[in-house]
């Protein structure tokens, strides 16, 4: 897999101050540190105003990166990227999960997830507690009860950002559902591995025309599905190929829907 920095420009040539700029972090999971490297490249190589994003979006573990960007004000890109780089350079010091007392088998049978993710909750409280978002955000998660995809940003206060990120990063199967805001949550990657349409709607609510919205997407899957000869595949390679195809289309689906839905 390679890191793709895919920029969708829903604009003609207008004054820069008239743009609503969106930064969307894909789900990523263990590859989210690469998103930070790509963001650093954007910051170092683009006009400073072009990376002063108005709306920040994140799905699954991309929601953590989104939250860390959002707690820094526009214009503080240097401090923001330094903090993010520092976090992921020391990722070996981060404990995101631990085994249940009787291991993954206990998780599968009685805990709702293979691993216990309470260490991740503790890390989020340490890193984000008391730090509020300074920009408009979207953080996607799925309500376990009804299956709705919900933007947790609507529920966030300064004291609740870490809880929202914890809910948005409750990776289905691996971790149990997270109970926050009176509901149970899974991460949103099963529906939108990359969230684009929601942030565009945020810009629209802020009074921007579609032609004045710019979306930068950081995703950790390829934008090209590799071909392979499957003539002699047995069951396991066929299943792996199916999963590869499924992940590819789910990853680019949100972007394609945005492009087709907002041709301006």
Feature-to-residue mapping (PLM):
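Cleavable N-terminal signal peptides of Sec/SRP-targeted secreted and luminal proteins
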Residues: 1-15
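Patatin-like phospholipase
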Residues: 12-57, 67-264
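Catalytic nucleophile serine of serine hydrolases
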Residues: 60
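Catalytic nucleophile loop
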Residues: 63
């Amino acid at each position: 897999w390679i890191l793709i920095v895919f920029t969708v420009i829903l604009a003609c040539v207008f004054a820069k101050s008239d743009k609503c700029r969106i930064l969307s972090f894909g789900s990523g999971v263990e590859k989210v540190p690469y998103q930070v490297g790509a963001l650093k490249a954007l910051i170092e190589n683009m006009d400073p105003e072009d990376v002063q994003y108005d709306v920040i979006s994140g799905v699954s573990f991309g929601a953590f990166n989104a939250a860390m960007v959002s707690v820094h004000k526009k214009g503080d890109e240097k401090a923001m990227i330094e903090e993010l780089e520092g976090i992921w350079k020391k990722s070996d010091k981060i404990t995101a999960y631990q085994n249940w007392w009787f291991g993954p088998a206990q998780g599968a049978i009685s805990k709702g997830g293979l691993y216990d993710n309470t260490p991740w909750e503790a890390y989020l409280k340490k890193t984000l507690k008391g730090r509020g978002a300074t920009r408009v955000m979207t953080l996607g998660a799925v309500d376990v009860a009804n299956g709705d995809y919900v933007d947790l940003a609507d529920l966030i206060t300064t004291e609740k950002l870490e809880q929202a990120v914890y809910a948005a990063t409750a990776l289905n199967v691996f971790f149990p559902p997270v109970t926050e805001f009176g509901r149970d949550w899974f991460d949103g990657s099963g529906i939108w591995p990359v969230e684009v349409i929601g942030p565009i709607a945020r810009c629209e609510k802020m009074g921007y025309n579609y032609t004045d919205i710019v979306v930068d997407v950081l995703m950790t899957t390829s934008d090209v599905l590799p071909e392979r000869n499957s003539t002699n595949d047995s069951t396991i390679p066929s299943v792996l190929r199916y999963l590869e195809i499924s992940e590819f289309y789910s990853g680019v689906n949100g972007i394609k829907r945005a492009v087709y839905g907002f041709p301006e």
